[in-house]
Amino acid sequence: MSFVVIIPARFASTRLPGKPLQDINGKPMIVHVLERARESGADRIIVATDHEDVARAVEAAGGEVCMTRADHQSGTERLAEVVEKCAFSDDTIIVNIQGDEPMIPPAIVRQVAENLAASSSGMATLAVPIHDAEEAFNPNAVKVVMDAKGYALYFSRATIPWDRDRFAQSRETIGDSLLRHIGIYGYRAGFIRRYVSWAPSPLEQIEMLEQLRVLWYGEKIHVAVAAEVPGTGVDTPEDLERVRAELR
């Protein structure tokens, strides 16, 4: 099947300045992400960045770059700029991989594209089971609940669904009902155009989760359990050291 990968790579980062260019065993992090995307079988891969140094690193690795504005408020807004500059047709399937995911399995990049192609929704994403109690109650681990057909009912930093009887007894065991959302998305290009035309929703502003805008406006997001659990993303210097060790 045909799909395009877009990798937003913003240079500024509060916790890890210059994050896309951080060295991981001799290569910039963004190049590791580019290589994983190539293994997914995507027809085209574009790195969207606002920084010339990132662009040079990607081009040196044989990658395609789209320069974007630095003032975007979200990753989806950056995608929308690329969609317009590249004049993608509305039915083009776009997979968004974060530029700080050097260990993302190529199989799940293709999985989210295939799931979207088989769905009637404009957007698709993935999740993985939560087995650890600490993760279950961690607001940085975003949870998702789905309906019987695999469409998202809600995403939250809170622990959902709340297992009333189990958690009343103990929060050390969490059962098997919790799913952690993975930040990989598939979109139809036309859906990205619609998304950025909507005003931000109250729920996304409360939870700080931009995907809630989609549910607020009555649209559907397809969710599936990922075929592989992705490795560590890079948000902090500690994450970076962990990834360096795992990829050594």
From Swiss-Prot:
Give the organism, scientific name.
Klebsiella pneumoniae subsp. pneumoniae (strain ATCC 700721 / MGH 78578)
The UniProt function text for this chain reads: Activates KDO (a required 8-carbon sugar) for incorporation into bacterial lipopolysaccharide in Gram-negative bacteria.
What's in the GO CC field?
cytosol
What family is this?
A: Belongs to the KdsB family.
Pathway where it operates: Nucleotide-sugar biosynthesis; CMP-3-deoxy-D-manno-octulosonate biosynthesis; CMP-3-deoxy-D-manno-octulosonate from 3-deoxy-D-manno-octulosonate and CTP: step 1/1; Bacterial outer membrane biogenesis; lipopolysaccharide biosynthesis
Q: Which CDD domains match?
A: CMP-KDO-Synthetase
Q: Which GO terms describe its molecular function?
A: 3-deoxy-manno-octulosonate cytidylyltransferase activity
Compartment(s) of residence: Cytoplasm
List this protein's GO terms for biological process.
Answer: CMP-keto-3-deoxy-D-manno-octulosonic acid biosynthetic process; lipopolysaccharide biosynthetic process
PANTHER family listed in its UniProt record: 3-DEOXY-MANNO-OCTULOSONATE CYTIDYLYLTRANSFERASE, 3-DEOXY-MANNO-OCTULOSONATE CYTIDYLYLTRANSFERASE, MITOCHONDRIAL
Which top-level group of life is the source organism from? Bacteria
Q: What is its EC number?
A: 2.7.7.38
Keyword annotations of the record = Cytoplasm, Lipopolysaccharide biosynthesis, Nucleotidyltransferase, Transferase
Name of this chain's protein: 3-deoxy-manno-octulosonate cytidylyltransferase
